[in-house]
A protein has these predicted regions:
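Core catalytic region of metal-dependent phosphoesterases/phosphodiesterases
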Residues: 1-63, 151-154, 158-159, 163-169, ...
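Catalytic metal-binding/acid-base residues of hydrolase active sites
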Residues: 1-3, 34-37, 73-74, 137-139, ...
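Short glycine-/acidic-enriched loop or helix-start segments at secondary-structure transitions
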Residues: 5-7, 39-42, 79, 141-144, ...
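Generic beta-sheet signal
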Residues: 31-33, 70, 208
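A short, sequence-level motif marking secondary-structure junctions
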Residues: 57-58, 71-76, 211
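Binuclear metal-dependent phosphoesterase catalytic core
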Residues: 61-63, 171-180, 192-217
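Active-site-proximal loop/helix segment associated with metal-binding centers of metalloenzymes
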Residues: 65-168
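Proline-aspartate-enriched helix->loop->beta-strand connector
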Residues: 128-138, 175-189
């Protein structure tokens, strides 16, 4: 994730791959996951010719598609991540000049997706969305329960409610698109590290596994 390493690590990734991306005329757009520092996704911190980490509610227009991007999800192991970081943060940060918004970490408290009605209203004025890319998914999509969720919840009293709210945010996003007559036909997401797809009420929902690719026609 963006934030597990120093910023220089991600800059080196760009330098290593820039030539072949230019030759292939390809771009990589990163949508925020729960293991990413949101500070990288404000539009300028990680923005290069062929690589960009985009803010939530970004609209991509490519190949005759208008694509809405909204990141974020809940880490069910967040208590472990917080405790683990507390053990190692002094050693890590003692080797850095100073802490800042993009200092390394294992968990970010603002990881969850957020529903922004104002941004959606603005989008509706200028765009007709046909494709949605998110990290998590609406509540009617798999997975309905992540493995070991209840075990993690034993030591995290707010976890089950936060996970439910995460999916409700996606439901609100979908509802806003529907009532404003957006021609949504595809919805892509990840988060659950499995592969699944289903056509539900005219929308093809596709959960992508790690390193799984899907072509949008």
């Amino acid at each position: 994730g963006f934030g597990f390493e120093k910023k220089e690590y991600y800059e080196q990734m760009v330098r290593r791959n820039a030539k072949r991306m230019n030759q292939a005329n390809n771009w990589i757009v990163f949508v925020r996951g729960n293991h990413d520092n949101p500070a990288y996704f404000e539009g300028t911190t990680f923005s290069y010719k062929r690589f960009i980490a985009v803010p939530d509610y970004t609209i991509l227009q490519a190949c005759n598609h208008s694509i809405l991007c909204v990141g974020g999800a809940i880490s069910i192991d967040r208590i472990y991540r917080i405790n683990e970081w507390n053990k190692r943060k002094y050693r890590v940060h003692s080797n850095e000049l100073q802490e800042n918004d993009i200092s390394r970490n294992l968990y970010w408290k603002n990881e969850a997706p957020a529903y922004d009605a104002d941004k959606m209203n603005t989008i509706c004025v200028d765009f007709l969305i046909d494709t949605v890319v998110t990290h998590t998914a609406p509540s009617h999509c798999e997975l309905f329960s992540k493995s070991n969720l209840n075990q993690w919840a034993e030591n995290d009293s707010l976890l089950l409610g936060d996970v439910q709210l995460e999916r409700e945010v996606m439901d609100m996003l979908l509802h806003h698109l529907k009532i404003n007559n957006h021609p949504v036909s595809h919805w892509y997401y990840g988060h659950f590290h499995q592969s699944w797809h289903s056509d539900i009420d005219g929308i093809l929902y596709q959960m992508l596994d790690i390193m799984e690719f899907s072509q949008v026609y």
